[in-house]
């Protein structure tokens, strides 16, 4: 089984997190690919996908990443990803932009669901105390929602700006979860 690893970035931080993921998965995960240098045609060729997206403070209701993902979102539902496991991670700043923490991750989630993907890798809110609201909280996706007990993020939130010291451990724990959920 080979998992595709894709990311969009403006600062390089999303690519750095891909490096941590690759360390955890080894050869089960392909080398990370920047979506600005590749089209989506290869997505269905993988047994599953892990995709990373930053949330950039664009002030927009849509196209929140400020990366190549924004131009590719509407093409995702045209892919045949029925039943393929897809996990997402998003970068954001829970202190500086705590009112829209990792919002762009919700956009990817929505479009991959439309393609029939089996979404995996949901993460508990435990340990994420700094943010005030997010659009990527389950069960209220795409609504600006304040965190409540029992909710989950629709992927792994990563805060390299305010909680960078927690990133590697969060990624390691998430990858352990993904290996089970993806059958690796």
Can you name each region flagged by the protein language model?
Residues 28-39:
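A short beta-strand-loop structural module common to alpha/beta enzyme folds
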Residues 24, 28, 45-184:
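FMN-binding flavodoxin-like domain, especially the glycine-rich phosphate-binding loop
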Residues 2-24:
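N-terminal beta1-alpha1 ligand-phosphate binding loop
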């Amino acid at each position: 089984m080979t998992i595709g690893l894709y990311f969009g970035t403006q600062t390089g931080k999303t690519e750095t997190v891909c490096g941590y993921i690759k360390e955890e998965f080894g050869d089960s995960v392909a080398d990370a690919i920047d979506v600005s240098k590749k089209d989506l045609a290869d997505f269905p060729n993988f047994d599953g996908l892990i995709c990373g997206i930053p949330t950039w403070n664009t002030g927009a209701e849509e196209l929140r990443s400020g990366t190549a993902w924004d131009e590719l979102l509407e093409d995702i539902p045209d892919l045949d990803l029925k039943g393929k496991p897809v996990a997402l991670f998003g970068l954001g700043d829970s202190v500086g932009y705590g009112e829209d923490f990792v919002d762009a991750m919700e956009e990817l989630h929505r479009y991959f669901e439309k393609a029939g993907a089996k979404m995996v890798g949901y993460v508990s809110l435990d340990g994420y105390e700094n943010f005030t609201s997010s659009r990527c909280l389950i069960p209220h996706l795409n609504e600006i929602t304040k965190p409540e007990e029992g909710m989950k993020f629709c992927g792994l939130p990563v805060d390299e700006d305010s909680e960078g010291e927690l990133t590697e451990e969060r990624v390691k724990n998430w990858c352990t979860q993904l290996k089970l959920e993806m059958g690796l």
